[in-house]
Amino acid sequence: MRTLIERYYSQYYFIDTTITDPNLTEDQYVNQHTNELAVIGVAPSHPVLQQEISKIEFKENAINNEVSGVRKTGGFKLQSNTILCVITCSNGKEYFLRSCIKGKLLEINKELINNPSLLKTNHATSGFLAIVEPMIKDKFMENPGLIKFEEYHKLRNIPIQKGPVFLKDNTNDED
């Protein structure tokens, strides 16, 4: 365990199986926290990270979503293909980002509306799209389209980079 994400999250990636062109990689990440909530964002292979983003528009039902109480009542119900937002690039290309999993929308990152460049500069951390309470918690991998961190990096031919190793993190199961 090295970075906060590596330490407290199980990392998964949503691969859009409807796209048949292997050069199109509009993948997204789904990081499940130890408290079972999921953080949705843009994977490093997504083409939007290579372009100039002009605006990010969240769907009206996502912006007006309000949850309250310990049980987070009132959250908007999501299907895995529910569109959370539309990203428009300076060249006119639009990307539709989905929720990736079934669940209840708890929060969207409204900071992206005013500062769309945050998605490019910090896509893995403060540039997240949404926080979702998954419907399937115990068997998270049963969400269709999700693959594990290692599988994703192997599939997309991306080298795995880990954070620094600290003495207190050294265990027999990590190399």
From Swiss-Prot:
Organism of derivation: Dictyostelium discoideum
Where on the tree of life does the source sit, at the highest rank? Eukaryota
TM segments?
none
Gene Ontology cellular-component terms for this entry are: nucleus
PANTHER family from the entry? PROTEIN ABITRAM
What is this protein for, i.e. what is its function? May regulate actin polymerization.
Q: Which family does it belong to?
A: Belongs to the ABITRAM family.
Matching InterPro entries: Abitram (IPR039169), Single_hybrid_motif (IPR011053)
- Could you tell me the gene encoding this protein? abitram
Entry protein name: Protein Abitram
